[in-house]
Amino acid sequence: MLKDRLENYKKIEKLRNSKLLVYITGDRPGFETQIHPEILDYFINHLDNLKKERKITLLLYTRGGNTLAAWSLTNLIRQFCDEFEVLIPSKAHSSGTLISLGANTIIMTKQATLGPIDPSLNSPLNPQNPQVPNNPQARLPVSVESIKGYFELAKKDLQIKDTQSIANILIGLSNQVHPLVLGDVYRSRTHIHMLA
């Protein structure tokens, strides 16, 4: 199986006239992985083994992850090539979309999808996952866009305008989601607007 995969990678390199890097995160229930800063060292090791290339192709499959890690990865790869392209066979959502937007070229199959840049924050301060009550480490991810959507619902759809009611909504939310996580949501949203 590995031998077949490596042969396919060589074929892609030949077809694209490029050096190929592969980054796949998992989305199988219970085994989900995301774009994370810890991958940068692995990419540095691979890229250091290459000389400066004319073109690098990143084969990417991901549901997303840390936006800063995605942006850092894009900048890292661009240091090692004149042309950077992303090859998407299926999904490059959220932070994967951000990586793709940083490339010179995006190549997608007919069924491939990009998605909104909607990172989910994961930290020890996130709400505990009620489906895993015996594991205090099990935390729910907090979607940046879901928090924004909650406030948009209150302000626009429900037309709540007075300061006290908005304060009560914020207090209620901060009882469910730690205030420092809410601060990270704001920071992440600002960061996304700057990058994308």
Labelled PLM ranges:
Residues M1-L98, G102-A196:
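Terminal-region recognition feature
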